[in-house]
C-alpha cells in the first residue's frame, strides 16, 4: 500500500499537478494539507475522474485538509477536538486493510512564528489538545499520522 502526503498550498491551483501525480504514482491514499478551499469549492469531479474518493475538511483561503483514497473510508471525523479558532486542520478516517482497521490522521499544524505572539500561544494550545486526542487513538488501534 502506498500512502502519500502533500502540502499542496491550494488544491485548485495545483489540480493539474495532483492529477498528474495520481496518474504517475497511483498512491492508494493521498493526504493533502493546506488545500485552501471550502468544501463547496473543492475540485471533487477532477479527482473522482482519476478513480479516487474525496474526504474534505475545507476552509476559505487558509488551512484545510483532505484525504483521497482508492477505497471507501469509514468513520470520517473533522474537528476531533474543539478548536477555539475553528480552523480546518485535522481530518481522520478508518481504513480497512486486510484484517485490520487503521486510523488515518491527516494534520496541518499551525505555524507558531514568532515566539511570544498570539500565533505561538495558539500553536501550543492546539498541540496540547492534539496530543490529548492522539493518546486516546494510540491505545485503541493502529494509526498512520501524517502532516
Predicted features, each with a name:
Residues 25, 97-99, 137-141:
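Glycine-rich phosphate-binding loop signature in dinucleotide/nucleotide-binding domains
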Residues 120-141:
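A long, amphipathic alpha-helix that forms part
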Residues 111-123:
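Active-site-proximal segments of metal-dependent phosphoesterases and phosphodiesterases across multiple
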Residues 6-11, 79-82, 121-124:
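Short, flexible loop segments at the rims of nucleotide/cofactor-binding pockets, characterized by
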Residues 1-53, 62-65:
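N-terminal, active-site-proximal structural segment of metallo-dependent hydrolase catalytic domains
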Residues 13-16, 88, 125-132:
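Short, contiguous clusters of charged residues that form electrostatic/catalytic patches at enzyme active sites
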Residues 35-38, 42-114:
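Structured beta-strand-rich core segments of catalytic domains in phosphoester-bond hydrolases
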Residues 142-147:
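Acidic/histidine-rich, metal-coordinating catalytic segments
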Amino acid at each position: 500500500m502506498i500512502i502519500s502526503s502533500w502540502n499542496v498550498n491550494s488544491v485548485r491551483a495545483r489540480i493539474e499537478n495532483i492529477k498528474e501525480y495520481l496518474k504517475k504514482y497511483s498512491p492508494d491514499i493521498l493526504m493533502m494539507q493546506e488545500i485552501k478551499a471550502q468544501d463547496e469549492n473543492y475540485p471533487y469531479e477532477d479527482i473522482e475522474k482519476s478513480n479516487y474518493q474525496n474526504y474534505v475538511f475545507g476552509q476559505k483561503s487558509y488551512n484545510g485538509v483532505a484525504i483521497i483514497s482508492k477505497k471507501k473510508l469509514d468513520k470520517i471525523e473533522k474537528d476531533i477536538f474543539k478548536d477555539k479558532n475553528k480552523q480546518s486542520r485535522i481530518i481522520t478516517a478508518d481504513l480497512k486493510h486486510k484484517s485490520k482497521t487503521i486510523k488515518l490522521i491527516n494534520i496541518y499544524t499551525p505555524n507558531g512564528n514568532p515566539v511570544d505572539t498570539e500565533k505561538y500561544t495558539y500553536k501550543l494550545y492546539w498541540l496540547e489538545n492534539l496530543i490529548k486526542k492522539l493518546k486516546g487513538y494510540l491505545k485503541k488501534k493502529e494509526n498512520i499520522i501524517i502532516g
